[in-house]
A protein has these predicted regions:
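Flexible mid-to-C-terminal extensions adjoining Fe-S/redox cofactors in radical SAM and related proteins
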Residues: 3-7, 19, 62-63, 67, ...
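Conserved alpha-helical substructure of the radical SAM core
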Residues: 17-20, 25, 32, 38-169, ...
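Short loop/turn motifs at secondary-structure junctions and domain boundaries
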Residues: 64-65, 260-265
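Residues immediately within or flanking Cys/His clusters that coordinate Zn2+
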Residues: 72, 76, 80, 262, ...
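A short acidic, helix-capping loop that chelates divalent metal ions and anchors anionic groups
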Residues: 92-94, 178-185, 249-250
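Conserved C-terminal portion of the radical SAM core fold
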Residues: 112-121, 140-147, 168-174, 192-254, ...
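Short, well-ordered alpha-helical microsegments
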Residues: 128-129, 155-157, 219-223, 280
Length: 340
């Protein structure tokens, strides 16, 4: 199923627009039905499905039904740590290019009927803690689950207590639980500061806390220790393969892509926003044909208008057969496969 319906034109009759939408959906569908004797019943079922999605709550189309998309906001490139696995912190956005939080909240409001989750990442999201909490409060009002991926340096009791009340998920990046390696992997000597904050987060958040580790040649011996530590503290743990974000870490020799070409990348359902408001389908977006430039910018355009462009739809179609290494990133995996 394609992502969107065409936007209604203000001067176009409502009925005529519906006819255009119907024909535009059915023509490509009919071409995909290989067995002639199944054409009429399949067309009937497709028409019923079309009617439900055409008139239910929102004009944006779903991939697999209601709440089929994830909205991911890289709120900043800036970071207080200097992790060698990542080079994002080397390119902090200028202050005058940082998106005003209300632009993102407006985007969230426009899309919330379609979202199963909103995720905030970085850089370090909690550098903008006030903005993060505004988004968390709005997500709660809109009944959209939220996830923050953080290094935990800026966590405090007040933030954690309110976050717990909102019912959202917190994911903390941990690649070692030993002081020396921790400080090496973080590029900062902050083990004794951050570890107590992680334990405080567990105490307050309980099952709303997750730990995520990056598997690379450098961290391979540390990850089993992190996994065991999480088991001892009853914290769900996820391992993500190393990706090229401009860092110096290298992939393990045994690393393999877990998806074949027949399994569509989940990122085609993603809606990703950069710190300046640029919209892409995936943070490796520019490696995809037709995607060398952003699809639009939510500070200048309505998000639905951006998603309704032909290029946005074509990029999503291309991603059905995309098999780049970023397919193994957490944001591109089905949620049921992430934590154990």
């Amino acid at each position: 199923m394609s992502l969107i319906y065409r936007l209604r034109k203000s001067k176009q009759p409502h009925f005529i627009q519906g006819v255009y939408d119907y024909i535009g959906e059915m023509k490509p569908f009919v071409k995909r039905v290989r067995k002639p004797h199944l054409l009429l019943p399949m067309l009937l079922f497709k028409s019923i499905e079309w009617g439900i999605y055409r008139w239910y709550k929102t004009p944006i189309r779903r991939f697999y039904g209601v709440k089929g998309n994830e909205l991911i906001y890289m709120i900043t490139n800036a970071c207080n740590d200097r992790c060698p696995k990542c080079g994002i912190w080397e390119r902090p956005e200028p202050q005058d290019q940082h998106l005003l939080v209300m632009h993102f909240i407006n985007c969230l409001k426009r899309l919330h009927h379609n979202l199963y989750q909103v995720t905030l990442t970085g850089g370090e999201p909690l550098i903008f803690k006030k903005d993060v909490m505004l988004i968390a409060e709005e997500a709660k009002k809109l009944n959209v689950p939220m996830v923050i991926v953080t290094n935990a340096r800026f966590l405090d009791e007040a933030f954690l207590t309110r976050y717990k009340e909102l019912g959202h998920i917190l994911v903390i990046s941990v690649d070692s639980v030993e002081r020396e390696k921790w400080n090496e992997f973080r590029g900062r000597k902050n083990f004794d500061i951050v570890m107590p904050k992680i334990l405080l987060a567990k105490q307050i958040l309980g099952d709303q806390l997750r730990i995520q580790s990056v598997l690379s040649k450098e961290s391979a011996e540390e990850i089993p220790k992190v996994k065991e530590w999480c088991k001892q503290h009853n914290i769900q743990h996820n391992i993500q393969f190393n990706q090229d974000f401009g860092g110096t870490w290298t992939n393990t020799k045994t690393e393999e892509v877990n998806y074949d070409n027949d399994t569509p990348c989940a990122a085609r359902k993603n809606i990703c926003v950069y710190p300046n408001g640029d919209v892409v389908k995936c943070f490796d977006h520019r490696r995809i044909p037709l995607a060398k430039e952003p699809l639009g910018n939510i500070a200048k355009q309505d998000i639905i208008e951006i998603l309704c462009t032909k290029r946005s739809t074509e990029v999503s179609k291309i991603m059905k057969s995309c098999n780049l290494p970023c397919k193994n990133m957490s944001c591109n995996k089905p949620q049921t496969l992430l934590f154990n």
